[in-house]
């Protein structure tokens, strides 16, 4: 019951974020353009408004990115390190997007990439994870994301990147993202990553001292 309640609250809060200003006002459903609350166990829709409207998900995209990374890792994060590619860093040039200043050629522990992507909304971290679960390039990771969308039978979602930077071909609906979150919560380690609100990590390539990702 505790897990179910937490999942439902997470879904509600996620979809209130679709509306500018919603964070300041709180989750007032009457003022929310679109939302979808589901039963995390069954997928049954409990309440909704415009749940199939296609919207730009922004960083909510990272729910899928983190879910696929956790699925591949299967809870075995120890000693897994990822090498930062040129594309991870320089594909974000000029976007003024959130990042953790990864550097090409650096080795990053998988666990740090996961938490940085979730807690700092790091787009370079999301790129790194996409290469990890895609087995090659960022594009391979995006293809895996869209393959998962198809496997889940979702009709109103398409991803063009793993982080959520605006693109005409990058969209989802409240219903689809609720189902993506439901699936992601079933992946080993995802719930811990998704609900963590503070972590210290030592990223030596940006700072010699522990960095607070909260």
Segments from the language model and where they lie:
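Positively charged n-region of N-terminal signal peptides that target proteins for export
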Residues: 1-4
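Sec-dependent N-terminal signal peptides
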Residues: 7-13
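C-terminal segment of classical bacterial N-terminal signal peptides
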Residues: 15-22
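Active-site-adjacent loops and short helices of periplasmic peptidoglycan-processing enzymes
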Residues: 24-175, 184-188
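Acidic/histidine-enriched alpha-helical segments
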Residues: 83, 189-203
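Hydrophobic "lid"/C-terminal helical patch
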Residues: 181
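Single conserved hydrophobic/aromatic residue that forms the stacking wall/gate
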Residues: 205-214
């Amino acid at each position: 019951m505790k897990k179910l309640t937490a999942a439902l609250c997470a879904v509600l809060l996620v979809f209130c974020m679709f509306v500018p200003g919603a964070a300041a006002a709180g989750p007032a459903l009457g003022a929310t353009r679109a939302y979808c609350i589901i039963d995390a166990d069954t997928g049954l829709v409990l309440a909704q408004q415009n749940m199939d409207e296609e919207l730009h998900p922004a960083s909510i995209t990272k729910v899928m990115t983190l879910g696929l990374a956790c699925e591949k890792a299967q809870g075995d994060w120890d000693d897994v390190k990822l090498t930062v590619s040129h594309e991870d860093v320089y594909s974000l040039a000029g976007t003024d997007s959130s990042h953790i200043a990864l550097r090409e050629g650096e080795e990053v522990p998988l666990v740090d990439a996961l938490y940085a992507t979730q807690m700092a909304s790091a787009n370079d971290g999301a790129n790194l994870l996409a290469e990890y679960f895609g087995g090659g390039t960022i594009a391979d990771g995006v293809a895996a994301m869209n393959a998962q969308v198809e496997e889940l039978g979702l009709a109103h979602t398409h991803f063009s990147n793993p982080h959520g930077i605006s693109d005409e071909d990058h969209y989802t609906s409240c219903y689809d993202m609720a189902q993506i979150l439901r699936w992601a919560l079933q992946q080993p380690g995802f719930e811990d990553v998704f609900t963590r609100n503070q972590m210290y990590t030592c990223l030596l390539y940006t700072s010699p001292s522990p960095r607070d990702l909260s």
